[in-house]
Amino acid sequence: MSEYRFETLQLHVGQEQADPATDARAVPIYQTTSYVFHNSKHAADRFGLADAGNIYGRLTNSTQDVLEKRLAALEGGSAALALASGAAAITYTIQALAANGGHIVAQKTIYGGSYNLLAHTLPQYGINTTFVDAHNLAELEGAIKEDTRAIYLETLGNPNSDIPDVDAIAEIAHKHGLPLVVDNTFGTPYLFRPFEHGADIVVHSATKFIGGHGTTLGGIIVESGKFDRKASGKYPNIAAPNPSYHGISFYDAVGPAAFVTFIRAILLRDTGATISPFSAFLLLQGVETLSLRLERHAENTKKVVDFLSKHPKVEKVNHPALADHPDHALYQKYFPNGGASIFTFNIKGGQEEAWKFIDNLSIFSLLANVADVKSLVIHPASTTHSQLNDEELADQGIGRNTIRLSIGTEHIDDIIADLEKGFAAI
C-alpha cells in the first residue's frame, strides 16, 4: 500500500481486506495464548523461521501483527515489534545493541525514565552511557569510543521539546559504523519521520500520541532495514549464528527485519514484555485518528504558546516555535506543520507558585502521562524528574519553577481560560 498517503495508511495497513476468518471490517481481538500447527513440519518451519506466522502468544498475535505492520508503514520502516510499554521498547533496543558491555552515546535532555535506565539501571548490567549536549556535535562525536554501539536521541526532548539535528547526527553515527536510535514518541510519524533523516531504529511509547486517549500502555520498535550489522562486526548476536536459536543468523535469515526478529525471538521470548491483544486493539483505534488529533494538538499548542509568551506572570516559555528559542531553526526545518504540544514554561517565583498554579487548574489534569486528547500538567522537578539531583535538573533545563504542559484537543478558549485560573491564584 506504499502508494497511499499517511491518512489512508493509518486506517488500512495490515488489514487491506476484511478479516479472512470472520469477514469483520474492524481488526478482531485474537484473545488466545497459542495457535494450532497444520502438521509437524509446519510447526518445525514456524520455529525455524522458515515460515512466518504465529507460534505462541508471548511472541506474536494476529491483532498485534496488524499494529506492527501499520506502524512500520507509517514510519517508513521494514519491520516493527509491539511491546507492553515504551520502557520495554527502549530497554530491549539498548540491550540488543549493547550486549556484552557495550557503550551508548545519548542526548542528555531526554525523558527522566530513559535517563534513569541509561544512567543507573543498565550500568549494573555492563552497559554504560555517556550523556552529551546533542547540539554540540563535536562533543557528541568525541564521546564515541571503541565499544560504542549506538547513538540515542529524542526528536523532541522531554520535557522542554528541544530538537537535535538528526541529519547531522546520523551522518556522524554512520561515519563510525553505528546505528542512530531515535525516540519519536513526541514527534510521531505524522509530523516527523526519522528514517527520512538517517535514523536506523525508531522507538515509541505508544502509550502517548499513538494511543492518544490515556487508556493503554504500549511500546513500538521499528527498524529501517538499511543498517548493515554484519559489515561492522559489532553486533554478533544479530549477524552471527545464535547459539540459543539453532545457530541461526538473524541477519541471514530475515535480512531487513533482523533487528526486531532478534528481539522478538530472544529477548521477548526470555523476558516476556508482551503486549496484550486487547492493548494492541486499543492502540489501533488511536492510530486510526492520529493525523486528525495531531493537527488539533498543533493548532491548540501554537495558541497556548502565544498566550503564555505574553503573560506577565510567566518568566520564560520553552518552546521551539518561538523565534528566540535556540532550536527555532531546527523546528522550522523538521516540524513545518507544527508540533511540540508537550513543553514547559517557567512561572515567576519558585516551587510554591508552581504548585499553587497547578492546584487551581480544572481542565488540566495533574498526572504523569502526556500526549493525551485531554490537557495535562505536572511539576517535573518534584515528580517525573525527581530522581535527578539539582545539577542533573539544571543540565536538563528544569528548575523548581518549571511547569510541563501537554496540550489537548479541547476548545482553545476553554484551555486558555483554565490557565488564567491558575495564574489568578498566585
Stretch-by-stretch model annotation:
Residues S2-N61, K69-R70, I403:
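N-terminal "arm"/small-domain region of PLP-dependent enzymes with the aminotransferase-like
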Residues L156, T185-G187, L322, K348, ...:
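Active-site beta-loop-alpha junctions enriched in small/polar residues
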Residues N39-T91, G113-H120:
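Conserved N-terminal alpha-helix of the aminotransferase class I/II PLP-enzyme fold
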